[in-house]
């Protein structure tokens, strides 16, 4: 049976940390920032960690 291919879209959007957690970028932080307040803009430029079932699903898509 051939090897399963990893999901290329998921590979581009998610990264794994050295401890195995899944890291992602937040949405809505690239343009139209003049409408958003400073606190929101700062928060949108931080990375977020996935938890629970979603992290498990993404790991399967990336590692396949």
Curated annotation (Swiss-Prot):
**PROSITE patterns hit by this protein:** RIBOSOMAL_L35
* Ribosomal protein as UniProt keyword: yes
Any one Gene Ontology MF annotation carried by this entry is: structural constituent of ribosome
In Gene Ontology terms, what is a biological process of this protein?
A: translation
Instruction: Choose one Gene Ontology CC annotation of this protein and give it.
Output: cytosolic large ribosomal subunit
Q: Which UniProt keywords apply?
A: Ribonucleoprotein, Ribosomal protein
Q: Which domain of life is it from?
A: Bacteria
Q: Which SUPFAM superfamilies match?
A: L35p-like
Q: Which Gene3D superfamilies match?
A: 4.10.410.60
Family label? Belongs to the bacterial ribosomal protein bL35 family.
Q: What is this protein called?
A: Large ribosomal subunit protein bL35
């Amino acid at each position: 049976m051939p090897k399963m291919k990893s999901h290329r879209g998921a590979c581009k959007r998610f990264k794994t940390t050295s401890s195995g957690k899944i890291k992602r970028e937040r949405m809505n932080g690239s343009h139209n920032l003049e409408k958003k307040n400073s606190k929101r803009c700062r928060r949108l430029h931080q990375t977020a960690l996935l938890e629970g079932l979603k992290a498990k699903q993404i790991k399967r898509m990336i590692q396949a």
